[in-house]
């Protein structure tokens, strides 16, 4: 199965164009004011139009209410909703039903115990994103450049598509894919020159590294 590469936290047309030209399968737009990657609806709509027909547009929210989600869906018209907060399985199911869009639920991972919630989320989400659990005191749940122990997913039995995130770089993406056998990778801080500032060359280099791993696995 082809590998999905997602570049998350894009906030400018230049970096979005760089990700698209490099072959990103998904572009992630962040709607969370505590993040340096947060975009307003107007900017997000412009980036989504640029990506239309070239990559899937993913709207990342954190414990968003229906009003915020409705505004995003109406204005940006994303292909996928990424729920990156503490949304319960019931809330995930409700959002999926209300907005009639596929949903990817992020699960924070630090120890094997964190996988206990997986079956309940897998029953309602369309895709799972395994991300590193944020350190204590962090003001946002992801995009922190922190990795988790990928071997926790080594014997994972999951029929649902899943991606890995957290601390990925062009130097470790091959190991992450080899160990987890994930169907996709999601990167944000690993392709930045500063928090929230995407680097087009790092984007290109990461996608090349991920694609090289994909070719080796064929």
Curated annotation (Swiss-Prot):
The keyword Transcription does not apply. This is N-(5'-phosphoribosyl)anthranilate isomerase. GO terms for biological process: L-tryptophan biosynthetic process. Its EC number is 5.3.1.24. Belongs to the TrpF family. Pfam families: PRAI. GO terms for molecular function: phosphoribosylanthranilate isomerase activity. It catalyses: N-(5-phospho-beta-D-ribosyl)anthranilate = 1-(2-carboxyphenylamino)-1-deoxy-D-ribulose 5-phosphate. NCBIfam families: PRK01222.1-1. Pathway: Amino-acid biosynthesis; L-tryptophan biosynthesis; L-tryptophan from chorismate: step 3/5. It is an enzyme of class 5 (isomerase). The keyword Hydrolase does not apply. It comes from Rhodopseudomonas palustris (strain BisA53). Keywords: Amino-acid biosynthesis, Aromatic amino acid biosynthesis, Isomerase, Tryptophan biosynthesis. InterPro entries: Aldolase_TIM, PRAI_dom, RibuloseP-bd_barrel, TrpF_fam.
